[in-house]
């Protein structure tokens, strides 16, 4: 395991290739301001990476500050990327393509069904992202 980060160079650690990743990746992160809100706006973050790389667990994507300062609930999701998420083999039901987008859709459905238990308003949800995450937002509209 080679450490390819550059300590002291701002922003370099966020792309550290030594971040633990797994095919078992369908997880959500939920940040709630204290005290627990009632009917709060929900912001859902989708990370970028060209649909090839990325994870919501990078420190730069920590939603606790946004949740605390703006009194909103912040949710981020992981989804399959690369061949596991976007390989399409026409005629092969085991690789229909765009599985990463279906992972995102599943996360969005989960938020709609469960966010009220966290103090969120399922009718006040905003999607946002960068790069492939922003493209994903447009694909879900």
Curated annotation (Swiss-Prot):
EC number annotated for this UniProt entry: 3.1.1.8
Residues found modified as Phosphoserine: 131
Sites where the protein binds substrate: 49-50
Record has Iron as a keyword: no
Compartment(s): Secreted
Glycan-modified residues: 39
GO annotation, cellular component aspect: extracellular region
GO MF, one example: cholinesterase activity
Tissue expression profile of the protein: Present in most cells except erythrocytes.
Residues at the catalytic site: 131
Record key words, sorted: Disulfide bond, Glycoprotein, Hydrolase, Phosphoprotein, Secreted, Serine esterase
Catalytic activity: an acylcholine + H2O = a carboxylate + choline + H(+)
Gene3D superfamilies listed in its UniProt record: alpha/beta hydrolase (3.40.50.1820)
One matching Pfam family: COesterase
Catalytic EC class: hydrolase
Primary role: Esterase with broad substrate specificity. Contributes to the inactivation of the neurotransmitter acetylcholine. Can degrade neurotoxic organophosphate esters.
Subunit structure: Homotetramer; disulfide-linked. Dimer of dimers.
UniProt similarity note: Belongs to the type-B carboxylesterase/lipase family.
Name used for this protein in its record: Cholinesterase
Native organism taxonomy: Eukaryota, Metazoa, Chordata, Craniata, Vertebrata
């Amino acid at each position: 395991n080679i450490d390819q980060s550059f300590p002291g160079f701002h922003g370099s650690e966020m792309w550290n290739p030594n971040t633990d990743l797994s095919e078992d990746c369908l997880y959500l992160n939920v940040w709630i301001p204290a005290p627990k809100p009632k009917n709060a706006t929900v912001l859902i973050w989708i990370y970028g990476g060209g649909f090839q790389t990325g994870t919501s667990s990078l420190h730069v994507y920590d939603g606790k500050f946004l949740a605390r300062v703006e009194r909103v609930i912040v949710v981020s999701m992981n989804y399959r990327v690369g061949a596991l998420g976007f390989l399409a083999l026409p005629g092969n039901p085991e690789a229909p393509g765009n599985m990463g987008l279906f992972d995102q859709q599943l996360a969005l459905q989960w938020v709609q069904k469960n966010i009220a238990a966290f103090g969120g308003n399922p009718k006040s949800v905003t999607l946002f992202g960068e790069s492939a995450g922003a493209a994903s937002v447009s694909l879900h509209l």
